């Protein structure tokens, strides 16, 4: 018996002012089944129950690209998007599904996970997404990636200041970094603002909300690239987490 994802059309509409098409919903279902299958070989996620998967992987991924509940205006046609530390493909794969006119680069340092994601992209027929086995500190210093992206997504990877150091060097001027967090405090905002300023960015929005099924607290931090990032950032692999700005 196949586990069926809930459609949640009303909740999508209420929380994102958007609903998936039948084709997108079918791809979400296929993605869910592929993740369950892959979980047997790889430790991809502990979130496997249909409603929990819908809320914590699909909804959470897309809520990040819907600042203040406005999904559609967020990703311009042809946007170049990068998902850093994609893991099992979140948030990047759901975003690629709903934004077919964007190009998505999914980055992870674990080759096995990237090999799995490549198989997912093939099964889903997602031609607008590609993968990369690397680390943010490395690609942030490579000319083919530095200042090449419109949007950078990062979920559950290190401190917020480390996330800023991973994302801002990759963004074009005017680009936007989206940092997905759980809880968040005013003190954290102050230290993040200091770090972001050094990296050529500004904290544009801190969006706090609750998830629609379990009412869990979430925050998304939106950082705008307003100036060139100094050449010494990002620092070497491991340094952003060991010695935060």
UniProtKB/Swiss-Prot annotation:
GO terms for molecular function: rRNA (guanine-N7-)-methyltransferase activity. S-adenosyl-L-methionine binds at residues 85, 90, 108-110, 136-137, 155. The keyword Zinc does not apply. Its EC number is 2.1.1.-. It comes from the Bacteria. InterPro entries: rRNA_ssu_MeTfrase_G (IPR003682), SAM-dependent_MTases_sf (IPR029063). Disulfide bonds: none annotated. One of its GO terms (cellular component) is cytosol. Keywords: Cytoplasm, Methyltransferase, rRNA processing, S-adenosyl-L-methionine, Transferase. It is found in: Cytoplasm. The keyword RNA-binding does not apply. It holds the Pfam family GidB. NCBIfam families: rsmG_gidB (TIGR00138). Belongs to the methyltransferase superfamily. RNA methyltransferase RsmG family. PANTHER family: S-ADENOSYL-L-METHIONINE-DEPENDENT METHYLTRANSFERASES SUPERFAMILY PROTEIN. HAMAP family: 16SrRNA_methyltr_G. Specifically methylates the N7 position of a guanine in 16S rRNA. This is Ribosomal RNA small subunit methyltransferase G. It comes from Trichormus variabilis (strain ATCC 29413 / PCC 7937).
